[in-house]
Curated annotation (Swiss-Prot):
GO terms for molecular function: uroporphyrinogen decarboxylase activity. One of its GO terms (biological process) is protoporphyrinogen IX biosynthetic process from glutamate. Its EC number is 4.1.1.37. It comes from Vibrio cholerae serotype O1 (strain ATCC 39315 / El Tor Inaba N16961). Catalyzes the decarboxylation of four acetate groups of uroporphyrinogen-III to yield coproporphyrinogen-III. Belongs to the uroporphyrinogen decarboxylase family. Keywords: Cytoplasm, Decarboxylase, Lyase, Porphyrin biosynthesis. This is Uroporphyrinogen decarboxylase. The keyword Cytoplasm applies. It is an enzyme of class 4 (lyase). It is found in: Cytoplasm. Homodimer. InterPro entries: UROD/MetE-like_sf (IPR038071), Uroporphyrinogen_deCO2ase_HemE (IPR006361), Uroporphyrinogen_deCOase (IPR000257).
């Protein structure tokens, strides 16, 4: 495999010295870029884009051509696993993902199997291999999955939800059914992420987008324990390097200590927590990723730079162990030049923190 020309992202995740704070953006390959919209139109639809290795690689690399980002992230979707389980995923205009055959009972859970990463999900592994080849060692490639809880919300609700009534009804009235589903999903995520690592992903991330809708007790039982199982099951060394794992629970700031105790290398932060507080609480155990509000990218350049400076100052001296990112995905109508201001500001303004 090609030697990495820029390994700052991996080094920061392992709390090793870097000369500036590395940065990437969640959803950095996406609709805010006109070139992405053109490639998606060429593919026909979103899943066709995901399933074409050359086009998936093209959109993964597009933001790196515009901005000096320190990592690439696989272009894919968190719903690939439930799709491969046969739930009939489609993306409906104006309403997001919809599953034609949602999980409603124990029989539905019993029916689904653990997808073969080099079978039903081989298109994802082909994309990882293609991206690694096309990156030519410029920056590391991040693989990812949704968390078992977050995947289960879509599978039980039948799509996106605001109130999560169906899955919470299952959680409170038939917890053994939900645990059986979550256990299958955890095994599927372990298999899927390990296959991504073998195919060339140099770090992995688990997105627990909906963990923050749970009570503290339910978060431990229905989300965190399954992410802990995933961390325990992952390949942690490959190609002679540590493969860092980042866990990100949106609205999970109250549970940082418990997340850090899973054995992950880094914890993702959304914008609702002060990074100085997060560092004081868990910075001795894990690296931190985050955590600018994506909406700041609508602001004029001086305001973007001011926010970057504030977050860097919050993390403070001894600045290794911080990967700068947004607190969630970049919004689709952000001007690309504002994303450029953000990335350049992180590099420029972080250098004094890395003497």
């Amino acid at each position: 495999m090609t030697e990495l020309k820029n390994d700052r992202y991996l080094r920061a995740l392992l709390k090793q010295p870097v000369d500036y704070t590395p940065v990437w953006m969640m959803r950095q390959a996406g609709r805010y870029l006109p070139e992405y919209r053109a490639t998606r139109a060429q593919a026909g639809d979103f899943m066709a884009l995901c399933k074409n290795a050359e086009l998936a690689s093209e959109v993964t690399l597009q933001p790196l051509r515009r901005f000096p980002l320190d990592a690439a992230i696989l272009f894919s979707d968190i719903l690939t696993i439930p799709d491969a389980m046969g739930l009939g995923l489609r993306f409906a205009a104006g309403e997001g993902p919809v599953f034609e055959r949602p999980i409603t009972c124990k029989a539905d859970v019993d029916k689904i199997g653990i997808p073969d990463p080099e079978g039903e999900l081989q298109y994802v592994m082909n994309a990882v291999r293609q991206i690694r080849k096309d990156l030519q060692g410029e920056v590391p490639l991040i693989g990812f999955s949704g968390s078992p809880w977050t995947l289960a919300t879509y599978m039980v609700e039948g799509g996106s939800s605001k109130a999560f009534t169906k899955i919470k009804k299952m959680m409170y009235s038939e917890p053994t059914v939900l645990h059986a589903l979550l256990d299958k999903l955890a095994d599927s995520v372990i298999s899927y992420l390990n296959a991504q690592i073998k195919a060339g992903a140099q770090a992995v991330m688990v997105f627990d987008t909906w963990g923050g809708v749970l009570t503290p007790r339910d978060y431990q039982q229905f989300s965190l324990q399954y992410m802990h199982k995933i961390v325990d099951g992952l390949i942690r060394e490959n190609e002679g390097r540590r493969v860092p794992v980042t866990l990100f629970t949106k609205n999970g700031g109250m549970w940082l200590e418990q997340i850090a105790a899973t054995g992950c290398d880094a914890v993702g932060l959304d914008w609702t927590i002060n990074i100085a507080d997060a560092k004081a609480r868990v910075g001795d155990k894990v690296a931190l990723q985050g955590n600018m509000d994506p909406s700041i990218l609508y602001a004029p350049a001086p305001r973007i730079r001011e926010e970057v400076a504030s977050i860097l100052a919050g993390f403070g001296q001894g600045g290794t162990g911080h990967v700068f990112n947004l607190g969630h995905g970049i919004h689709l109508d952000v001007p690309p030049e504002n994303a450029g201001v953000f990335v350049e500001a992180v590099h420029e303004l972080s250098k004094p923190y890395h003497p």
